[in-house]
């Protein structure tokens, strides 16, 4: 079991509804490990720098996730409720962590130009699982990620 976890890609998942977060977390296993599900841009901006340093945030907006902070996330993925300002806030928090060049996680935001069922519908979560797997597969293979704007690819 520990071996499967060590091979799973660690990520931080951000969204509005824990019911969707739980569904997506379970649907991404065993290849992708959700370290923590964060709710809201303010909490995420506060929590991610701790996660990047390998420690649990002192306060958490959610307790969904593996809680294993020993491997930094490869990506911070935000759901449909996140706008460009929220992305910028989290990006600034990541930059403030003072990571070595090239080690910061990629920030991905849901492409709202893609028609989806409305959250928290189960179908929304299923589509999100599929889209996250596709994008993270590209990332793992070193392929270029592209979307309608920077960071919007999921």
Positions of the model-derived regions?
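Well-ordered, non-membrane alpha-helical segments in soluble/globular domains
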Residues: 45-63, 87-93, 125-133
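Intrinsically disordered, low-complexity domain-flanking/linker segments in eukaryotic proteins
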Residues: 53-72, 101-107
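Ser/Thr/Gly-rich flexible loops in soluble cytosolic domains mediating phosphotransfer, phosphorylation
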Residues: 93-145
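Structured beta-strand/turn binding interfaces of compact recognition modules in eukaryotic regulators
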Residues: 14-16, 79, 110
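Extreme N-terminal segments of fungal proteins
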Residues: 1-61
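Eukaryotic N-terminal low-complexity, Ser/Thr- and Lys/Arg-rich leader segments
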Residues: 1-9, 101, 143-154
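Mid-chain, well-packed structural core segment of small domains
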Residues: 71-106
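Long terminal accessory regions outside catalytic cores
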Residues: 28, 64-72, 84-85, 92, ...
């Amino acid at each position: 079991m520990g071996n499967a976890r060590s091979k799973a890609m660690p990520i931080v998942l951000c969204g509005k509804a824990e019911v969707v977060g739980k569904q997506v977390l379970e649907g991404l296993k065993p290849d992708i490990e959700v370290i923590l599900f964060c709710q809201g841009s303010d909490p995420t901006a506060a929590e991610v720098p701790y996660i990047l340093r390998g420690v649990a945030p002192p306060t958490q907006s959610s307790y969904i996730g593996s809680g294993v902070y020993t491997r930094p996330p490869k990506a911070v993925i935000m759901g449909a409720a996140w706008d460009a300002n929220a992305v910028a806030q989290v990006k600034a928090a990541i930059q403030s962590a003072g990571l070595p060049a090239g080690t910061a996680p990629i920030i991905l935001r849901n492409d709202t130009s893609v028609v989806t069922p409305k959250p928290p519908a189960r179908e929304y979560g299923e589509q999100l699982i599929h889209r996250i797997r596709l994008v993270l597969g590209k990332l793992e293979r070193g392929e270029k990620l592209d979307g309608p704007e920077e960071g919007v690819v999921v």
